[in-house]
Amino acid sequence: MAVPAKKRKMNFSEREVEIIVEELELKKHLLVNHFNAGVPLAAKSAAWHGILRRVNAVATCRRELPEVKKKWSDLKTEVRRKVAQVRAAVEGGEAPGSTEEDGAGGPGTGGGSGGGGPAVAPVLLTPMQQRICNLLGEATIISLPSTTEIHPVALGPSATAAAATVTLTQIPTETTYHTLEEGVVEYCTAEAPPPLPPEAPVDMMAQHADTSVKPQALKSRIALNSAKLIQEQRVTNLHVKEIAQHLEQQNDLLQMIRRSQEVQACAQERQAQAMEGTQAALSVLIQVLRPMIKDFRRYLQSNTANPAPTSDPGQVAQNGQPDSIIQ
């Protein structure tokens, strides 16, 4: 019995790839290798399933979790391959697969004695690949071609007698991209010197072209080091700002405590003043009442010392006493 062939699913659309990259940018502290140190596997699995749900919400066919992970792995492999080509070009070597073997021609130089060799094709990253490059923490150098056409310069008769033929071309503007935090790509542009006029003959040996490539590589490395220093400086500035904000919060808290202590001190001072006023009023009242108490005491003592008064005889006769006293 023949086994039915497995039906191949549709390729990932741009929207699906955009959702995968967007979710990984949001969850890079959970899923990207150089960010997720110490993250448990359960949290990673939950994050991947969340990405799968978002992808299936816009996909035309249902995706599985291994497919999404495989797509992310393919995207990383493609970006790293291009970054390796750029680094090889910067360090003086040729990117794999970028030129054909036709003499010893390099970027901007001719190969062989018959004429100019093929130029190295610039490695360009799409905006999506630049975002992936930022997630991977790769610093890339991308040579963008100039809008002006490349004009070869005619050589003089003295140069034709040299061991190798040199064709000077206009060096395109080189733009250097660097990876910064929070998915930001910053670039610094090194402008090339103005091209020589086509009619001016140049007497130059082949080794001069090799020496002219080294300053470009040196400039690129200096730009990379400068970008790293700028990134470290920005991180340091962020830490300093956080420390300054923390100190400001502590200062505000200390000021609130000091104000509350001042309010408590004012309340205690007012309470002490009120107590002093009460004591003064009581002392004045005692001084006023003391003479009155003395007078009242004397009055009581004088009434106690006087004898009782004698009864009236007329009143006794009228009350039924003998009339002999009246007669």
UniProtKB/Swiss-Prot annotation:
- Principal localization reads nucleus
Question: Superkingdom of the source?
Answer: Eukaryota
Give the disulfide map: none
The UniProt keywords, alphabetically, are: Apoptosis, Nucleus
Task: Quote the InterPro entries the UniProt record gives.
Answer: Myb_DNA-bind_5
Gene Ontology BP term (one): regulation of mitochondrial membrane permeability involved in apoptotic process
Q: Where in the cell is it found?
A: Nucleus
**Positions of the UniProt region annotated as Required for nuclear localization and apoptosis-inducing activity:** 1-70
Q: Where is the composition biased (Gly residues)?
A: 104-118
Q: Where is this region: Disordered?
A: 87-118, 303-327
Q: GO cellular component terms?
A: mitochondrion; nucleus
User: Per the record's keyword annotation, is Transmembrane helix included, yes or no?
Assistant: no
* Function, as annotated: Induces apoptosis.
Task: Please state which protein family the record places this protein in.
Answer: Belongs to the NAIF1 family.
- What does the record note on quaternary structure? Interacts with HARBI1.
| Protein name, entry field | Nuclear apoptosis-inducing factor 1
State the gene name recorded for this protein: NAIF1
